Amino acid sequence: MQRKPSQKSATDKLFNHRINEKITGVSRVRLVSDDGVAIVSFEEALRKAKEENLDLVEVSADQELHVCKIIDYGKYKFELLKKNKEAKKKQHVINVKEIKIRPRIESHDYEIKKKHAQEFLGKGDKVKVSLRFRGREMMHSDLGMKVVYRMIEDLKEYGLAERDPIQDGKQIVVIINPK
């Protein structure tokens, strides 16, 4: 029975740097330190890092000369985690909220559905307005279209329809994007 390869977590992917003696197969490096940028031997770069009680961290291995920095790796990891956490906070996931209505909806029910749609659009979510026909209501699809167009018109100041309402079988659907 074979083992599954282990899944790397997000933090493992963030910290895939080689440090100190783990940097192998390199004779010369481009060293970035407080003194500036210099091309030195790997041993000299490691010695400088040890003298300053810091770590030699490989930042980039893409070029012919590997780029290394002399930094406190623990502090560097903490800063990267902090930046990553801040970036996640700033992300906003757009959800699609659905409002279901009927062709012969009462005015009070319509107002409540409209109010919910306004709240969703105010939060930055998309709203999918779907009007469903039952039985013989299909014969009066124009009545359903009027209700959907009325909803689009009432929500104009909160969002705009992606495209005109589409009748798909027994329902009419339109998606409204927030402004």
From Swiss-Prot:
GO MF terms held by the record: ribosome binding; translation initiation factor activity
InterPro entries this protein is in?
T_IF-3_C_sf (IPR036788), T_IF-3_N_sf (IPR036787), Translation_initiation_fac3_CS (IPR019813), Translation_initiation_fac_3 (IPR001288), Translation_initiation_fac_3_C (IPR019815), Translation_initiation_fac_3_N (IPR019814)
The record's section on PROSITE patterns has: IF3
Disulphide bonds in the chain? none
State the compartments where it is located.
Answer: Cytoplasm
Quote any Pfam family the record assigns.
Answer: IF3_N
Primary site of residence: cytoplasm
Leader sequence segment: none
Query: What Gene3D superfamilies has UniProt attached to this entry?
Result: Translation initiation factor 3 (IF-3), C-terminal domain (3.30.110.10), Translation initiation factor 3 (IF-3), N-terminal domain (3.10.20.80)
Name the UniProt key words of this record, in alphabetical order: Cytoplasm, Initiation factor, Protein biosynthesis
Q: Which domain of life is it from?
A: Bacteria
Q: Which residues cross the membrane?
A: none
- Please, one GO biological process term? ribosome disassembly
Of the GO CC terms on this record, one is: membrane
Which function does this protein serve? IF-3 binds to the 30S ribosomal subunit and shifts the equilibrium between 70S ribosomes and their 50S and 30S subunits in favor of the free subunits, thus enhancing the availability of 30S subunits on which protein synthesis initiation begins.
Q: Which family does it belong to?
A: Belongs to the IF-3 family.
Assembly, in brief, is: Monomer.
Q: What is this protein called?
A: Translation initiation factor IF-3
Q: Where does this protein come from, organism-wise?
A: Leptospira borgpetersenii serovar Hardjo-bovis (strain JB197)
Q: Gene name? A: infC
